[in-house]
């Protein structure tokens, strides 16, 4: 079983430690590596390839405001290659590592 599936139910924190939501689902690549984290509360996908898990939490290198304003995924039918591309671009434009290294070191 891929390790990322153990993230289900874990708290998601942003790069600064602010709570974002809870892992409701993890979408995997064909090789089992994590691709997207889905949080039901916000109905958004969060890129999982830079996520770090431990101590019952998953940390992602994005600010909560960026995640909260990401494109909404209302149904799995909307999870198309076009939606993924738009979502990937959304996060690429707003990625913030400034608090990431300091948060992980603490």
What are these regions (language model features)?
Residues 1-106:
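Peripheral interaction segments used for macromolecular assembly
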């Amino acid at each position: 079983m891929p390790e990322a599936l153990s993230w289900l139910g874990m708290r998601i924190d942003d790069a600064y430690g602010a709570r974002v939501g809870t892992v409701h689902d993890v979408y995997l690549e064909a090789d089992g590596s994590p691709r997207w984290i889905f949080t039901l509360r916000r109905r958004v996908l969060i890129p999982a390839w830079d996520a770090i898990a431990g101590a019952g939490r998953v940390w992602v290198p994005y600010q909560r405001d960026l995640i909260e304003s990401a494109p909404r995924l209302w149904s799995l039918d909307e999870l198309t290659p076009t939606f993924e591309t738009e979502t990937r671009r959304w996060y690429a434009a707003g990625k913030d590592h400034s608090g990431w290294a300091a948060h992980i070191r603490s």
